[in-house]
């Protein structure tokens, strides 16, 4: 737990203030990362990941795509930073604020956009209900088939790495 007199809390608070100031002044996320000493990449250290994510979320609050591109261009632990930014801005802009060309490319058979939308609607309805609401789940066999297929691809890559040239 971070307490106000804890030096770690003070460090995080200072970095978050810098993130807010940098976003207000128009610095890009890459420039902000450089400013806090992350010239080469954003590490997975929480005190760097969170301020960069907060900066991108504030600086690019009107453009989900620009925010995501900026944090990925920062380098390093981009999946974590992008997940945080995506969660913050995705909640703010909703499905209509996501880039259409990105959404159109989403495909994780057997879970598709219709499944995700239905699940979201069930979750919203469950907020008004004291009873758990059923949701349609992808068929277990379909998920198992898909996962075995990808496991075989991963294993093939692993075994290929055992063969020359190393």
Give the predicted meaning of each segment.
Residues 1-8, 101-114, 134-146:
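A broadly tuned preference for mixed-charge, low-complexity surface segments
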Residues 1-75:
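Accessory "access/gating" subregions that flank catalytic or transport cores
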Residues 8-23, 29-40, 88-93, 103-109, ...:
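Short, Lys/Arg-enriched charge-dense amphipathic segments
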Residues 48-134:
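Catalytic phosphate/nucleotide-handling subdomain of diverse soluble enzymes
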Residues 126-166:
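C-terminal domain-closing interface element
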């Amino acid at each position: 737990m971070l307490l106000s007199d804890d030096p770690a809390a003070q460090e995080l608070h200072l970095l978050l203030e810098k993130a807010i100031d940098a976003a207000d002044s128009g610095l890009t996320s890459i420039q902000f990362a450089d400013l806090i000493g992350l010239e080469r990449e954003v590490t997975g250290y929480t005190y760097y990941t969170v301020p960069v994510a907060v900066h991108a979320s504030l600086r690019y609050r009107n453009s989900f795509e620009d925010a995501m591109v900026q944090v990925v261009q920062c380098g390093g632990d981009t999946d974590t930073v992008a997940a945080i930014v995506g969660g913050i801005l995705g909640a703010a802009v909703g499905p209509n604020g996501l880039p259409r060309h990105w959404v159109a490319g989403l495909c994780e058979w057997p879970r598709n956009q219709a499944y995700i939308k239905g699940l979201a609607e069930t979750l919203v309805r469950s907020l008004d209900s004291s009873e758990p609401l059923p949701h349609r789940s992808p068929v277990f066999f379909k998920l198992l088939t898909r996962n075995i297929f990808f496991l075989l691809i991963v294993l093939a890559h692993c075994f290929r790495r055992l063969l020359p040239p190393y």
